[in-house]
From Swiss-Prot:
Changing residue 40 to N: In the I-A' sequence. The record marks 26-27, 53-54 as: Reactive bond. It comes from Phaseolus angularis (Azuki bean). Disulfide bonds join 18-72, 19-34, 22-68, 24-32, 42-49, 46-61, 51-59. It comes from the Eukaryota. This is Bowman-Birk type proteinase inhibitors I-A, I-B, and I-A'. Belongs to the Bowman-Birk serine protease inhibitor family. The I-A sequence is shown. GO terms for molecular function: serine-type endopeptidase inhibitor activity. These inhibitors strongly inhibit trypsin.
Length: 78
């Protein structure tokens, strides 16, 4: 599989950090983690990405933030 790093302004699923299932603790500040599963890669802003060894790999970003990224599924497409 070929991975392209391009700096175009085209929004692509892999390059923009987004999260549909974001889990936060009730602490202040909250500790939020994205539980989304992506195939073969995590979004570009992810520092700690963990993937299964299956084909294709199921990847989760293990980063913790005090916020959630915007949802990946845009509401205006349907």
């Amino acid at each position: 599989s070929v991975h392209h790093q391009d700096s175009s302004d085209e929004p692509s699923e892999s390059s923009h950090p987004c999260c549909d299932l974001c889990l936060c603790t009730k602490s202040i500040p909250p500790q939020c983690q994205c539980a989304d599963i992506r195939l073969d890669s995590c979004h570009s802003a992810c520092k700690s990405c963990m993937c299964t060894r299956s084909m294709p790999g199921q990847c989760r970003c293990l980063d913790t933030h005090d916020f959630c990224h915007k949802p990946c599924k845009s509401r205006d497409k349907d």
